[in-house]
């Protein structure tokens, strides 16, 4: 790699990387893959978190990832599987839970508790006769699929205002229609830009004065904290590196935020993707990472920068989070059906 001799200081954003929901989900997969290895290999429905490195490391431990539970039958013919499936951190529609139970699978539901809270609200408001406007960035995002699946007949997908037109399945907040404007509530994907979500809610509130807006706490604390950390560092740096998968919604929002504040912001997933031209003319650099990015990848980038820039000053900026979530308990097929 070419010289990066102009770089003098790196600011590492705190918090960055794994949030409590991701830690809980990954630890659950690792622990149960080990605990069940005598019975067979573990299956996870959907990527446990949206990070290729995490998925590859778990695959190396014999964990299988499927996008359709029907794939479990095929895998059973080829491999010795444990009769257990882990649901990823993003949440899933009731139909998937029922399917797992009907297949006789024990379920470990590693859905983030903050996502579960939004699911609970969707069910409650639908039962009370409200129309739900669900703000998201893509109808294909697993979290949107899961929340929508709780009340599909009363939910309308709405694009966060910065993504209008990018996915035709998401309505424009400025023109969206609901059958009863007197009974309408807004819910949101938890990993969006805080500022963009609040701006979208403001647009909807103008359109529907009776709009019910649940607590701002529905926006994930980790998403908010990581965005605030980028805002704090931005005035001190000339460029930003964001370690994230392109499939991580919270990571891509960090990248967009850094680009809007600094102008020069670059995405990478692994240290070896670092490119010298990104840092030409840069003396101060900010680094952050998505809530599903392992910390050793960040440190790998820092090590490369130090090797290229002797005397490089590395500043940890901000505070770490202290929140932790309890690991899920296994649910029998009967217990899953009761709650589906």
From Swiss-Prot:
Pfam families: LYTB (PF02401). Its EC number is 1.17.7.4. Binds 1 [4Fe-4S] cluster per subunit. [4Fe-4S] cluster binds at residues 19, 112, 220. Its cofactor is [4Fe-4S] cluster. The active site is at residue 143. GO terms for biological process: dimethylallyl diphosphate biosynthetic process; isopentenyl diphosphate biosynthetic process, methylerythritol 4-phosphate pathway; terpenoid biosynthetic process. Signal peptide: none annotated. Dimethylallyl diphosphate binds at residues 50, 90, 141, 248-250, 292. InterPro entries: LytB/IspH. GO terms for molecular function: 4 iron, 4 sulfur cluster binding; 4-hydroxy-3-methylbut-2-enyl diphosphate reductase activity; metal ion binding. It comes from the Bacteria. Pathway: Isoprenoid biosynthesis; dimethylallyl diphosphate biosynthesis; dimethylallyl diphosphate from (2E)-4-hydroxy-3-methylbutenyl diphosphate: step 1/1; Isoprenoid biosynthesis; isopentenyl diphosphate biosynthesis via DXP pathway; isopentenyl diphosphate from 1-deoxy-D-xylulose 5-phosphate: step 6/6. Keywords: 4Fe-4S, Iron, Iron-sulfur, Isoprene biosynthesis, Metal-binding, Oxidoreductase. CDD domains: lytB_ispH. Isopentenyl diphosphate binds at residues 50, 90, 141, 248-250, 292. Belongs to the IspH family. Catalyzes the conversion of 1-hydroxy-2-methyl-2-(E)-butenyl 4-diphosphate (HMBPP) into a mixture of isopentenyl diphosphate (IPP) and dimethylallyl diphosphate (DMAPP). Acts in the terminal step of the DOXP/MEP pathway for isoprenoid precursor biosynthesis. This is 4-hydroxy-3-methylbut-2-enyl diphosphate reductase. It comes from Thermus thermophilus (strain ATCC 27634 / DSM 579 / HB8).
């Amino acid at each position: 790699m070419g010289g990066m001799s102009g770089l003098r200081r790196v600011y590492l954003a705190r918090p960055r990387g794994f949030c409590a929901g991701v830690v809980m989900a990954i630890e659950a997969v690792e622990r149960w893959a080990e605990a069940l290895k005598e019975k067979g290999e573990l299956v996870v429905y959907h990527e446990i978190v949206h990070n290729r490195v995490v998925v590859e490391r778990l695959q190396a431990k014999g964990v299988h990832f499927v996008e359709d539970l029907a794939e479990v039958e095929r895998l059973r013919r080829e491999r010795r599987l444990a009769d257990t499936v882990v649901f990823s951190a993003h949440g899933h529609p009731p139909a998937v839970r029922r399917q797992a139970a009907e297949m006789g699978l024990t379920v470990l539901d590693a859905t983030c508790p903050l996502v579960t809270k939004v699911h609970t609200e969707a069910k409650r408001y639908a039962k009370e006769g409200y129309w739900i406007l669900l703000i998201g960035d893509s109808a294909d995002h697993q979290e949107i699929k899961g929340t929508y699946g709780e009340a599909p007949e009363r939910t309308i997908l709405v694009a966060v205002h910065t993504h209008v037109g990018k996915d035709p399945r998401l309505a424009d907040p400025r023109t969206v229609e609901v059958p009863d404007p007197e009974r309408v509530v807004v819910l949101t994907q938890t990993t969006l830009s805080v500022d963009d979500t609040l701006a979208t809610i403001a647009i909807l509130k103008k359109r529907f004065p009776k709009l019910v807006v649940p607590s701002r706490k529905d926006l994930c604390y980790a998403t908010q904290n990581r965005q605030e950390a980028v805002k704090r560092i931005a005035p001190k740096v000339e460029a930003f590196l964001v370690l994230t998968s392109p499939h991580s919604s919270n990571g891509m929002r960090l990248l967009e935020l850094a680009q809007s504040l600094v102008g020069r912001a670059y995405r990478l997933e692994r240290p070896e993707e670092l490119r010298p031209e990104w840092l030409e003319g840069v003396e101060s650099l900010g680094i952050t990472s998505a809530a599903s990015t392992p910390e050793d990848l960040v440190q790998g980038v820092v090590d490369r920068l130090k090797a290229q820039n002797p005397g490089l000053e590395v500043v940890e900026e901000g505070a770490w989070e202290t929140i932790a979530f309890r690991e899920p308990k296994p649910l029998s097929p009967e217990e899953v059906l009761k709650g589906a």
